[in-house]
C-alpha cells in the first residue's frame, strides 16, 4: 500500500485504543495490548498499526516523555496522526511534543490538570487543528477562557464539543481588543 492509499483509508480505520489501561508512563504502551473494537486493527507488514487515531484517555499519565519514540514503534506513519485523545489523565501542561504532529486535527485534553491558559499558545503552530477540548481543566476557570482560545486558535471549528459560530468569533475579537495589549513595535525612539 502506498502512502497516498494509506492517507485515504486510514482515516476510517479504528483507533489504536489504550484507554482505561491505568497507564502511568508512555513507554508502557509498547508492552500493553490495545483495546479491541468491533473491527480489527489493520497492521502493516512490519506489524505496526495503520491508523491515524491514538486514544490514551482515562489513564494516569502526567507527562508525555518519549511520546514520539513510542508513536514510531506503534504506528506505521506516526507523522500522519490526526486524532489524539489524552482526556482524563493527570497532565499539568500541553507538552510541546504534540506540536510535532502537523496533521493533527482533533486533540482532546479535557479532564486533566492544566492550570495556565497560556499553554494554549503552543497549539497555534498546528495548521490542521480543527477540534479541541480543554474543559474540566483548572484553566477553564480563568476569565475569558473561551475567547482566549478562539483568538489564539482561529482555525478551530469545534471547541469543548461545541461548534464555533460567527458570533463566537466576533465576541472573541472584541474580547481580544479589550484585553490583550498589542505588542509594541520596537523602534530606535523606544531606547532614547
UniProtKB/Swiss-Prot annotation:
It is found in: Cytoplasm. Keywords: Cytoplasm, Leucine-rich repeat, Repeat. It comes from the Eukaryota. Disulfide bonds: none annotated. The keyword Repeat applies. InterPro entries: Leu-rich_rpt, LRR_dom_sf. Residues 137-175 form the LRRCT domain. SUPFAM superfamilies: Outer arm dynein light chain 1 (SSF52075). LRRC51 and TOMT were originally considered as alternative reading frames, LRTOMT1 and LRTOMT2 of the same LRTOMT gene in primates. PANTHER family: LEUCINE-RICH REPEAT-CONTAINING PROTEIN 51. This is Leucine-rich repeat-containing protein 51. It comes from Homo sapiens (Human).
Amino acid at each position: 500500500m502506498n502512502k497516498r492509499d494509506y492517507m485515504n483509508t486510514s482515516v476510517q480505520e479504528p483507533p489504536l485504543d489504550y484507554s482505561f489501561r491505568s497507564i502511568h508512563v508512555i513507554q508502557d504502551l509498547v508492552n500493553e495490548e490495545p483495546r479491541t473494537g468491533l473491527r480489527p486493527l489493520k497492521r502493516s507488514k512490519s506489524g505496526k498499526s495503520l491508523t491515524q487515531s491514538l486514544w490514551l484517555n482515562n489513564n494516569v499519565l502526567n507527562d508525555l516523555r518519549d511520546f514520539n519514540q513510542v508513536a514510531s514503534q506503534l504506528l506505521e506513519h506516526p507523522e500522519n496522526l490526526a486524532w489524539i485523545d489524552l482526556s482524563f489523565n493527570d497532565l499539568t501542561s500541553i507538552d510541546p511534543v504534540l506540536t510535532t504532529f502537523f496533521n493533527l486535527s482533533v486533540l482532546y485534553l479535557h479532564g486533566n490538570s492544566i492550570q495556565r491558559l497560556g499553554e494554549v499558545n503552543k497549539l497555534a503552530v498546528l495548521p490542521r487543528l480543527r477540534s479541541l477540548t480543554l474543559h474540566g481543566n483548572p484553566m477553564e476557570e480563568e476569565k475569558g477562557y473561551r475567547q482566549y482560545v478562539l483568538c489564539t486558535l482561529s482555525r478551530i471549528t469545534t471547541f469543548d464539543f461545541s461548534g464555533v459560530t460567527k458570533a463566537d468569533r466576533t465576541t472573541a475579537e472584541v474580547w481580544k481588543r479589550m484585553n490583550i495589549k498589542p505588542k509594541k513595535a520596537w523602534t530606535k525612539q523606544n531606547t532614547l
